Curated annotation (Swiss-Prot):
Residues at the catalytic site: H172 (proton donor/acceptor), K176 (proton donor)
Origin species: Prochlorococcus marinus (strain MIT 9313)
Protein task: Catalyzes the conversion of 4-hydroxy-tetrahydrodipicolinate (HTPA) to tetrahydrodipicolinate.
One Gene Ontology CC term in the entry: cytosol
Protein name, entry field: 4-hydroxy-tetrahydrodipicolinate reductase
Keywords: Amino-acid biosynthesis, Cytoplasm, Diaminopimelate biosynthesis, Lysine biosynthesis, NAD, NADP, Oxidoreductase
Length: 283
């Protein structure tokens, strides 16, 4: 494995050939304080290809592998973590079905996980927090790396103090596997922190088509998910009151919007104690 000067942060990207993974590799390559040391992806027929050439950004001397365990083992040996501010960082943009095991493996090998994959359950997050504590390591699960989305979430939480009726809608590309999005769930959780109930029914509702009114949370908030080609990531929170409505909306039109948040997290995760959930905890 290529040696990395001590002032650089060694980074492994899992899901390297995906849309987000490829964008992260490009951002890491351009960052003056980071160095790509591993790339993992299970796309058939790509084992061993040079990842920089595959993505059209020049040779990076990093061969793509499908074996995350072998990659983590090699990285752990090359960049051994002996205390805070040390060790390698894993950035994961893969699939809800595998991200939990990837995160556990990262902690086991002493590699700090930065998880952008959504779909982790509450219990899985609790378990991962325990793994982080036992390993005395920092890690981060970030449902959305956009600073603009963090501002929307904070505005929605503030507005929830004054409005009793609200619904959330998230729109994504049709290759997103989980619904509702982790960002939408996180927004609802922030709105619910006051402990109030929303959307007291005015009539006895009847759905002629099951699911027409969206997913119902215990608080009364309803979450709606749309999946269409041509979309990237979009979210809207609409509040209603007699005589008015108040709408908050954020649109991501290109994945490059997430890269400042990704790099911010990569730079901070090695200094963290325990597992952090949400970009707002870091800015």
């Amino acid at each position: 494995m290529t040696s990395v000067p001590p002032e650089l942060i060694p980074v492994v990207v899992v899901g390297a050939l995906g849309r987000m993974g490829a964008e992260v590799i490009k951002a890491v390559h351009l960052a003056s304080d980071c160095e790509l040391v591993g790339a993992v992806d299970t796309t058939p027929g790509k084992e061993g290809v040079e990842i920089g050439e595959e993505l059209g950004i020049g040779v990076l001397d990093v061969a793509l592998t499908s074996d995350i365990e072998a990659c983590l083992c090699s990285v752990s040996q090359s960049f051994h973590r002996t205390g805070p501010g040390q060790g390698a960082v894993l950035v994961d943009f893969t699939h809800p079905s595998v991200v939990y095991e990837h995160t556990r493996a990262a902690f086991a090998y002493g590699v700090h996980p930065v998880i952008g994959t959504t779909g982790l359950s509450h219990q899985q997050l609790v378990d991962l927090s325990e793994f982080a504590a036992k390993a005395s390591m920092g890690g981060a699960v970030i449902p959305n790396f956009s600073v603009g989305m963090v501002l929307l979430q904070q505005a929605a939480a503030a507005a929830a103090r004054f409005y009793d009726n609200a619904e959330l809608t998230e729109l994504h590309h049709n290759r997103k596997a989980d619904a509702p999005s982790g960002t939408c769930i996180k927004t609802a959780e922030m709105m619910e922190e006051l402990g109030k109930s929303f959307n007291s029914p005015e009539v006895d509702e009847h759905e002629s088509l099951t699911g027409s009114r969206g997913g119902l949370r215990a608080s009364g908030l309803r979450l709606h998910s749309l999946r269409l080609p041509g979309l990237v990531a979009h979210q809207e929170v609409m509040f209603g009151a007699p005589g008015e409505s108040y709408t908050l909306r954020h649109d991501t039109i290109d994945r490059s919007a997430y890269m400042p948040g990704v790099l911010l997290t990569v730079r901070k995760v090695r200094q963290l104690q325990g597992l952090v959930y949400g970009l707002e905890r870091l800015i």
